[in-house]
Amino acid sequence: MLKTLGLRSLCPSLGGRGFRRHPNINKYTLSLVRVRWNHHLSNAEIQARIENIPQENYRNFSIVAHVDHGKSTLSDRLLEITGVIDKNSSNKQVLDKLEVERERGITIKAQTCTMFYHDKRNGEDYLLHLVDTPGHVDFRGEVSRSYASCGGALLLVDASQGVQAQTVANFYLAYSMGLKLIPVVNKIDLNVADVERAKAEIEDNFELPRDEIIGVSAKTGLNVKEMLLPTIVDRIPPPTGNKKKPFRALLVDSWYDSYLGVILLVNIVDGKLKKGEKVLCAHTNKKYEVKELGIMYPDRVPTGSLVVGQVGYVVLGMKDSSDAHVGDTLMHVGKESVTDILPGFEEQKPMVYVGAFPSTGTEFKAMDDDINRLVLNDRSVTLERETSNALGQGWRLGFLGSLHASVFRERLEKEYGSKLIITQPTVPYMVRMTDGTESIITNPDDFPDSATRRMKVEELLEPFVEATITLPQEFLGNVIKLCDANRGQQKEITYLNTRGQVVLKYHLPLAHLVDDFFGKLKAASKGYASLDYEDIGYRESDVVKLELLVNGQSIDALARVLHRTEVEKVGREWVQKFKEYVKSQLFEVVIQARAGTKIVARQTIKARRKDVLARLHASDVSRRKKLLEKQKEGKKQMRSVGRVQINQEAYQAFLKR
């Protein structure tokens, strides 16, 4: 298969003689290579064509939409129509390069692609740069970074679903960054499509003129070539940088390649960059020589230079991914005094933390390498080593949300074959001490005990979010009950006149949001509700640490921080569930749930009894009593010194949802 695709000559990393399978190549990658390298221009022709296009004919744009409204499908059609890839029924999610993206049908990592468009109206060529961004709220950092290199965006709305929560959130993000927005109604070919209603919602919610809205079908390509592409050229402004100014570029993204090291995705704000020139990274003050640079088409195509207004990749021979700070400014060495540093991006903070441990202790070293390798390509994950008395050596991982954590785990299992035991997700709590100092607790094991709380802690605070929920009016009662049951505080309720839709705004504890709130919301609304949220800071809360004790010994990996009103219910569920996975011992096993100093629930596993009277004669009463007393004393001693044997499978089963 590799020979027929001609990959050996095109990609030496796949091997020549003595070929072996590369660890980063899977069936999805091979199919993508086959699709992407199907364009008809050589590298020299691509470079020559770019050089003949003036800066005023550049258009950098993104696609703004809710999850599953057709961003990736529209990207595929644009790539086909502009000739980047051939028309092929297998062209699905071409820019979604991760296996987990294709399986889940979502975009996780923002991807970019340059396209050539020939406008028959004036006979001119245009250089279009598309960013396919994620729609889920967990990956909003990817979205905001992508918008920074764009002059405009397509506001995409599903004709059958209308405006949803994340459509609104991403619209305001794009609007606040000054992007020119082109409203587009997608899926107009569906039988259930209500195009006029979708247009009315766009007009009402975003105050965009109805006559500017374009109806398309990303699946069939209807109106994409005839209406959408000319509109992109007409309405989205070209980049405003100056070619004569000293070179400077904004570092938008980075990823790690085992052969080239760290590859940077940059937006050229001013000037020009050529291969062989020396550049300085402002954040680290480190200097590098440009080894290779070019555009994504949609894979790397070396062009020898990048000029103002272009978005492309740069290879500097950088080996440590921590040196690539997203939002950093790149400039020519020696031009530091005449080059202004760009504002950059606000660094995203993790909102969810989990403990991760190998399913068997012997796998720690190999899995440590796998996790570090994956973190290289996802800079939003924080990583620290931690040790558990119950589960041994592991890691404390920080994520942007529960979907982000789930995707990371799935990538680790699918791409590296690594199996993890993941603890319950926890959120960062703030502890304010009596002496005025503050600290953030991300591990329940570090939560202050009862004595410390009495003597040194002024107050405990937990993070809250403002959740925006869009749903049909018929499910309003169910969703309000769900929010109230999760300690929510209703702030606003808006009825959308167009089609019986309601927008709810609630203040919710982040801890409840990451505890499968989205799944519960889908169940309460039969899948029709959509959710968006934003951080609104910390609030004082009566939270306590709930521990699971086995014969008086706390199992640190299972501890959780909960509101005091929830500990009894959760504690009873815990001890009942954990009892199922602990095998009976030769002595009595007591399983307890403890909140602070109070035991809130208990279960007992009776001792496994050995028949010491089996060989006795029935009439030997004194001997019988003596043996039973001896057994009783032995069990008493065993209970005081014996350790309960709990295997890893028990923890894994207990933590599994």
From Swiss-Prot:
Its EC number is 3.6.5.-. Residues 56-240 form the tr-type G domain. It catalyses: GTP + H2O = GDP + phosphate + H(+). It is found in: Mitochondrion inner membrane. GTP binds at residues 65-72, 132-136, 186-189. Gene3D superfamilies: 3.30.70.240, Elongation factor 4, C-terminal domain, Elongation Factor G (Translational Gtpase), domain 3, P-loop containing nucleotide triphosphate hydrolases, Translation factors. Disulfide bonds: none annotated. Residues 1-21 form a transit peptide. One of its GO terms (biological process) is translation. It is a peripheral membrane protein. It holds the Pfam family GTP_EFTU. One of its GO terms (cellular component) is mitochondrial inner membrane. InterPro entries: EF-4 (IPR006297), EFG_III/V (IPR035647), EFG_V-like (IPR000640), EFTu-like_2 (IPR004161), G_TR_CS (IPR031157), LepA_C_sf (IPR038363), LepA_CTD (IPR013842), LepA_IV (IPR035654). GO terms for molecular function: GTP binding; GTPase activity; mitochondrial ribosome binding. Keywords: GTP-binding, Hydrolase, Membrane, Mitochondrion, Mitochondrion inner membrane, Nucleotide-binding, Protein biosynthesis, Transit peptide. Belongs to the TRAFAC class translation factor GTPase superfamily. Classic translation factor GTPase family. LepA subfamily. This is Translation factor GUF1, mitochondrial. It comes from Candida glabrata (strain ATCC 2001 / BCRC 20586 / JCM 3761 / NBRC 0622 / NRRL Y-65 / CBS 138). The lineage of its organism: Eukaryota, Fungi, Dikarya, Ascomycota, Saccharomycotina.
